[in-house]
Amino acid sequence: MSTHAETRAITAADIRAAKNTRRLAMLTAYDYPTASIADEGGMDMLLVGDSLAMVVLGHEDTLSVTLDEMIHHCRAVTRGASRALVVGDLPFMTYEQGPDQAMHSAARLFREGGVRAVKLEGGKEVAPQVEALVKAGIPVMGHIGLTPQRVAALGGFKVQGRSAAAARSLAEDARILEDAGCFALVLEAIPAPVAAHITRTSGIPTIGIGAGAQCDGQVLVVHDMLGLFDRFTPKFVKRYAELRGHAVKAVQQYGDEVRQGEFPAAQHSFGMPEDEQRRWEENVSGADD
């Protein structure tokens, strides 16, 4: 059970200031009830990730989700989170063309979605976008390593940075993104020693997902850690509950009780005052005659 008692809304500046002071906990959220649960559970940050394409909308990858869909879900999450910092993903092809496109997309996530930070994928190639957004007052979280929006170019969902050259490239990307103004950096599916090095040498918090225990914080997809998504489970996921199985059993029990006439019972139904019911029955009886 979380003992985190802070009630003030967390800001991107708070997250950056947490470097070397405390570990950060982050989960994805895509709707009001999940956001409310995660917020009450003491999460520092909630990510409205483009992973909603897979775990909520049923797509095979994250590439299909649109900016309008992201805004729709961001609205729901921001209504459910009173304390945690809500970060919205910029989806595929809404920022890659340059700073102007990134500014337009991020502004919509802020104004229409209500988020207080955005996340974008990529290394040195997106530094100009990061710089422009930060200059405009929009906090940016970076994301390197396995970047799902580039899964086609990466040849699938594979661990990144396993060669010395690739590891050096990741470390360089981390430095460039920090210099561009990112307040935090997601490290996804990279070797633990590489993530540890980036964490030690970076002045901003690193948030790991499949990047070992030495990161400044961790993030998981909420459907994975609660056992709600059964299509596949990444190696780096720990399941803290198996809610899908419980939910299926509950639905089956409901169906059985409906078909057997056991639901609704008297306590689930509404009655009438006795005198009004008597008048009603007399009226019905008279109409039948």
From Swiss-Prot:
Its main location: cytoplasm. Keywords: Cytoplasm, Magnesium, Metal-binding, Pantothenate biosynthesis, Transferase. Mg(2+) binds at D50, D89, E121. 3-methyl-2-oxobutanoate binds at D50, S51, D89, K119. It is an enzyme of class 2 (transferase). Its EC number is 2.1.2.11. Binds 1 Mg(2+) ion per subunit. It is found in: Cytoplasm. One of its GO terms (biological process) is pantothenate biosynthetic process. One of its GO terms (cellular component) is cytoplasm. Pfam families: Pantoate_transf. It catalyses: 3-methyl-2-oxobutanoate + (6R)-5,10-methylene-5,6,7,8-tetrahydrofolate + H2O = 2-dehydropantoate + (6S)-5,6,7,8-tetrahydrofolate. Pathway: Cofactor biosynthesis; (R)-pantothenate biosynthesis; (R)-pantoate from 3-methyl-2-oxobutanoate: step 1/2. Residues 266-289 are annotated as: Disordered. It comes from the Bacteria. Homodecamer; pentamer of dimers. Catalyzes the reversible reaction in which hydroxymethyl group from 5,10-methylenetetrahydrofolate is transferred onto alpha-ketoisovalerate to form ketopantoate. Belongs to the PanB family. HAMAP family: PanB. This is 3-methyl-2-oxobutanoate hydroxymethyltransferase. It comes from Oleidesulfovibrio alaskensis (strain ATCC BAA-1058 / DSM 17464 / G20) (Desulfovibrio alaskensis).
